[in-house]
């Protein structure tokens, strides 16, 4: 049963943070935002903000050390970090509605490495996808599905 939602909050959209806190409050789940700086959230429901130091991966390492299989869910965009968590048995989703599995992580890492090679060779430019209502709805549905699946 999911008791805690941990959010790798540095790059998590405000709309996702607000929804996560509101959704968790209805389900009696505790939310932790972890980042290397204070992160805004406009929800009136309670949440915990953990500010780590500014070392590379300090927020990821904090989340990894404090999560457990069976009681925790993590929201992150970081595929390498998701791989560490999934190996530990912790369910992981991103803010675009993907539930990470070993297979999906392997596929995404391969895509990322290929795209990075194209950029390094000058054959492509870095691409940063926008965040729209459709992606948010996929996230909200995925969050609900994973929570219900882990009741």
Question: Language-model segments: which ranges?
Answer:
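Nuclease catalytic cores that cleave nucleic-acid phosphodiester bonds
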Residues: 2-151
């Amino acid at each position: 049963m999911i008791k805690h939602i941990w959010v790798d909050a540095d790059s998590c959209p405000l709309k996702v943070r607000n929804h996560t806190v509101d959704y968790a409050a209805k389900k009696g789940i505790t939310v932790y935002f972890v980042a290397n700086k204070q992160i805004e959230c406009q929800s009136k429901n309670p949440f915990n903000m953990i500010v780590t130091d500014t070392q590379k991966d300090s927020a990821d390492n904090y989340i990894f050390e404090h999560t457990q299989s069976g009681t925790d869910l993590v929201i992150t965009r970081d595929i390498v970090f998701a791989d560490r968590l999934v190996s530990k048995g912790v369910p992981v989703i991103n803010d675009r509605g993907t539930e990470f599995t070993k297979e999906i992580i392997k596929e995404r890492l391969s895509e990322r490495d290929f795209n990075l090679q194209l950029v390094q060779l000058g054959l492509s430019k870095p691409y940063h996808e926008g965040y729209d209502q459709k992606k948010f709805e996929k996230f909200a549905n995925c969050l609900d599905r994973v929570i219900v699946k882990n009741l």
